Amino acid sequence: MCIIVILLAVVWILWSGEIRTILTIRQVGDNPYLYYMEYKASYDLDEVIAKDIDENAELLDYIVARIGKGLPIKAKSSQVADENGEVQTLNCTSFQARNCKGGFLYGRNYDYFANPTLITVSRPAKGYASIAASDMSHFGYSLDELPTSFKKKLLCLAAIYAPVDGMNEKGLCTSIMAIPHQPSQQNTPKHDVGTSVIMRLWLDRCATVGEALQLLDSLDVRHDASVGSGYHYMVADAAGNCVVVEFDKDDGWKTLTVSKQPEKNYMLVTNHLLSPKYYTTEPDPAVGNPNSRSWWRYATASEYLDAHDGVLSVDQALECLGLVHWDHLDLPNGKVEVTQYGNVYDQKRLTLRIRPWNQYDKYYDFEL
């Protein structure tokens, strides 16, 4: 009995945060592919930065080692390039608009395969609280492999490092959109961070767009070239400041930023570059993804936002996203894309409303 007590004490000492986190994981409502988690374990972004972890497999190995503390846990991401060396999915729509009730709304469609989604609330000891969405296929889950037992929930802990969009307690929001064939490969003496870690850093450490850009300038962002895609990001704060962050493929991947036009109440981004150096109103595979109808989505959502002068209710924000969502989009590589979810963050009231792909006529609400 004494040995058992000692072993239990050791387990609790080593994994108390992880255990307390796993105990919070639950299915949301009657949706078998939507989950919620409150992250209570420690994590060390400074260590990730110091190790220059910038590849997806490298990050997943680091996470698994940190979770397992020597135990043989395995995980594999589904986010890999096809036989042509590219990813033609992860094609999304994001916008910031004024909220008709005051403040700002941040709308987002996440277009990818039909995968389970995890909503994670984090309250780090040093940093801002946040709520974020993650595609669970990025850390080993699928429609056939779900977190239905304690053991199967272990890999949900990886979500803290892998948001695809989110909002923190200061109302700062961020999301990611794919740009095919253009993985940023910034290479200066600065430390490297990967695709999703920069977003976690923004959520944990930044209250404003200005702070987010300052943090960005202190690091090299390197997208995993093995995935076959690059990305740009939208960052928006509670005061209505909004930028799209891009990387200049023809000039050493220098950071480019596009700001919301002062005469507009909204800013919108899909899956083509907005920087004046590359922007075009006609589909061009050199600067975006025609396969996902990026330019059509941009024009369609812009028309709706212009018709409302960029001032929306939450329901209208969801309506706008609904105009450009996919039930079934056939891609040239033979795969089928859907809108995995559409969501709206209220940057003043700190709420999230989400519609998952398999219940797009229904929504779920969360509060930070």
At which residue positions do the language-model features occur?
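Hydrophobic H-region at the start of alpha-helical membrane spans
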Residues: 1-5
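A recognition module on extended beta-rich or small alphabeta surfaces enriched in W/G with H and D/E
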Residues: 128-140, 160, 266-288
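Secretory/export targeting leaders with adjacent low-complexity proregions
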Residues: 214-227, 233
